[in-house]
Amino acid sequence: MTRMVQCAKLGKEAEGLDFPPLPGELGKRIYESISKEAWQAWLKQQTMLINENRLNMADPRARQYLMKQTEKFFFGEGADTAQGYVPPSA
């Protein structure tokens, strides 16, 4: 049976994640209140941040930056956006 959550990002009930996507308290919080749809949106955003900012994921500072952006994306005022990015129009 599909696990449903009240998604904090999307503001609606949606299919929940199958397992915590990150270790620690943040991973638990995301698992309990973020949907698969919202997690996929974060993965796209994260990829843009890594590429546009040329983050080296072997650098602890880059990983710390992404963890802060993850928390801001789901539970804060929103993550940083890539410089000059214009979302495609529908």
UniProtKB/Swiss-Prot annotation:
Entry annotated with the keyword Iron: yes
Database matches in SUPFAM superfamilies: YggX-like
What Gene Ontology cellular component terms go with this record? Answer: cytosol
Task: Report a single Gene Ontology molecular function.
Answer: iron ion binding
Q: Name the Gene Ontology biological process terms.
A: cellular response to oxidative stress
This chain's function reads: Could be a mediator in iron transactions between iron acquisition and iron-requiring processes, such as synthesis and/or repair of Fe-S clusters in biosynthetic enzymes.
Protein name (database record)? Probable Fe(2+)-trafficking protein
Which organism's genome codes for this protein?
A: Paraburkholderia xenovorans (strain LB400)
